[in-house]
Amino acid sequence: MFEIFKTVLMLSCIGAGMTMLLLLLKPLTVRKFPAKWQYAIWFVVVVCMVIPLWKFIPQRDMQMMAPQEAVGQIAQSDNQENAAEIETVIIEQTPMEYREIPITASRSLRIYDLVAYLWFGGMGVFLLLAFGSYFLFLMRKKHGSIELTEYEIFEEVKKELHIRRHIRLRVSKAAASPMLVGTFFPVVYVPSNQLDKETERMIFRHELTHYKHGDLVFKWLALLVNAVHWFNPFAYLLSANVSEACEVSCDMAVIKNLSEQEQKFYMNTILDLVEQEKRRK
């Protein structure tokens, strides 16, 4: 267990360093790089905090060593084995009362194992709370909601974005703002208040663009980073910046093919929805 925790600590240090560097460079990257590239950069950090990439680098073995180096290592190994045998004989011939039993290393090992199990338990609690709150959230949204089938504007936007998969559309009183949920069985929830057709079209473009980009998968991966590195404050900063970059990237993708007037209308629609959500909280 402690070996796994050591790997996690290394990943955590790498991720913290990369996050700190990106936050320091953020004023520059926001001006120089488009939104999708900023999003991709944060994705790289997330991957580096989950996958120990150095384990995939091939290590040199005895076949790749020079003959002198290989002979040297073999001789050193033989010397270590002989020394171990001599030490064993000395220990066996030493009276019991004069033997020194090394217990410090054993105690340290127990402490390290305890820390590793504490980390594992914290990760379990984090995931339990995260999944529990998520399922309660879904139940609240689904309770009392109504599914809209073959909704014309929704289907039109799906065709515009070349989305063929069936995505359900539901109206919910518990939805403070439009949202896409469900990685395997996607559903778009919209508030129950009446909206004009153009506003609905902009909302559907936003949520379906999230689906097309696979943003839900990325957010689940960011949640996994939070769970594994729950002790690292930079993991929470990373998660917040991932969410921000995700929304900005989605907005830029939506307005890319819109006229200037439509872009203004879209941004005003998003700002109005954000204000409505804040008031409901």
Residue ranges and their predicted role:
Residues 2-71, 100-281:
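Membrane-embedded and juxtamembrane structural elements of multi-pass membrane proteins
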Residues 73-108:
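Low-complexity, acidic polar-rich segments
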